[in-house]
Amino acid sequence: EPTVLPARIPQLLLNGSAGIAVGMATNIPPHNLNELIAGLLALIENPEITDQELIQLIPGPDFPTGGQILGREGIRETYLSGRGSVTMRGVAGIETIEAPGRPDRDAVIITELPYQTNKAGLIERIADLVNDKKLEGISDIRDESDRDGMRIVVELRRDAYPQVVLNNLFKLTPLQ
């Protein structure tokens, strides 16, 4: 039984791949189908297309979990040389949570994770950092994800500075 079916599109770029062979590791991220097809059509029409023109058609990877790519230089370097790194960051914002019977509190709301980041592992890592007193200002962590989308609520203490806590989350956890 075949494990890979042939296709007229580059499945390796479409689905991405990760592996190690003969001491070399590779990690190819998934890409957007429409962008890949546009790049292929341009390459078929003009086999002498420049790297810059191709990069404009296929601007970067398309990660299924969302997240933000920080900077375009890492993508460009990877596409041109075959080596490079792409820094990913989850999407998080600061909101004020109103609860009846208690004062309003700020919270960090995480709505998207970087590619291949485990949600349960992230929550566990945040809890460990809070318990070890390496991450200050957090009073509660809740996973409010449902079928409408992912939502992790990191409730802050009243004396905490929300932007400082958010920066520490990026620095100390797999959120970046």
Where are these regions (language model features)?
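Intrinsically disordered, low-complexity regulatory segments
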Residues: E1-N15, I20-Q176
